[in-house]
Amino acid sequence: MAVGSGEMDSAIALGVEKMTETKGTDTTAALAEAADADYETIHGLSFVALNALVMQRYLFEYGWKHTDFAPFSINAHANALNNPFARLHEAITERDYIKARMIAEPINLLDASPIGDGAAAVVIVPAEKIKTNGRARRLVTIIGSASATDTIAVHDRRQITWLAAAEESARRAYSQAGVGPAEINFFELHDAFSIMSALSLEACGFAEPGQAPKLALDNEISLTGRIPICTMGGLKARGHPVGATGIYQIVEVVQQLRGEAGANQLDGARIGMAQNIGGSGSTIITHILRVK
C-alpha cells in the first residue's frame, strides 16, 4: 500500500525463520500461541490436534476416506523434486501415505508439513520505475491483495469445515483484481495440513463444499491440471519455516509468472494467487499477481 499510494518509492518484504535450535515441545508450544488460550491450548491441544478435529469432522460430513487425501501430499512431494530450495526431495506413493505414522488421528506424518529454517524476500517498486530501469525480466504486478479474520477459537465458528476468512479475503482480492477463480492459472495455498488444502480450494471457489478431494483424485491439482497448487512443493514438501512461508509463496508465484520455474514451469501462466493462513484460519491474506 505504501508503494502503491506513492508514499514510498520502494519497499522490501522479508520473511525469516529459525526453528531448528529449539526442542520440539517448545516449538509446538510457541506455535500454539496463535490458537485460543482459554479453551484450546490450556488443555494441551496443539495445531496438529486442532486440524485433526477439523479433518475428522470433514470426513464425517462429506463421506470421504482418509486415503482420499493422499493426492495432496503426493502432488506436493512430486513438485518439490525439482525445487532446489525444498526441504523434502523424495517422491511418495499412496502406499507410503497409507503406511505413514499416525500423529493425531486422522492426520498422519504425510498429512503434515515440516517446520524448519528459511528466509525469502521480495522487492516492491512502482511499475514506472521498472520500465525506466530497462530491466529485461517480465513485469509482475500485484492486482489484488486482501486480508480477513475469523474467530481464533475453532469451536466458535459457525462451521468448522469452512474457512470463512479465506472465502472473504479471496472475494475481496478477486474484486480488486477484476478476476474470478476461472481466471486464476495456479494457486499457492497454505497446505500446512492436507485438510487445509481442501478447505482453501473450496473457500476460494475452485471446488464446491466437500468436493476438493475429488479435484485432487482427478489429478486437477497437478502441474497439468485445471488448478495447479503448490507448484514448487508447498508447505508440505518445500517446508514451512513459519515466519518466511508467506514470502516464499510470493517468490514462487513470481517465478512461475516470469517463466523461471524450471522443470515445474506452467504453460502460459499469466495470473497466480497465493494465500497464507494464520492460526487455524483466524487470519488469512490473499494476493493475486499478474504478468504483463
Question: Where do the protein language model's features map onto the residues?
Answer:
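Glycine-rich, mobile lid/loop segments that gate access to catalytic sites or pores
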Residues: 29-31, 39-106
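Short acidic capping loops at alpha-helix termini that bridge into adjacent secondary structure
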Residues: 67-68, 180-185, 208-209
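Active-site-proximal alpha-helical scaffold in enzymes
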Residues: 1-17, 49-82, 122-128, 238-261
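Condensing-enzyme catalytic core mediating Claisen C-C bond formation in acyl metabolism
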Residues: 37, 41, 71, 102-168, ...
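A generic, well-ordered mixed alpha/beta core segment in the N-terminal half of proteins
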Residues: 1-41
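A glycine- and small-aliphatic-rich helix-loop capping segment at beta-alpha/alpha-beta transitions
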Residues: 3-5, 26-36, 128-129, 203-210, ...
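Phosphate/pyrophosphate-binding loops at sites that engage ATP/ADP/AMP, CoA/4′-phosphopantetheine
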Residues: 58-63, 132, 169-183
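Short glycine/threonine-rich loop-to-helix capping motif typified by GTGT followed
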Residues: 154-159, 191-214, 225, 241-243, ...
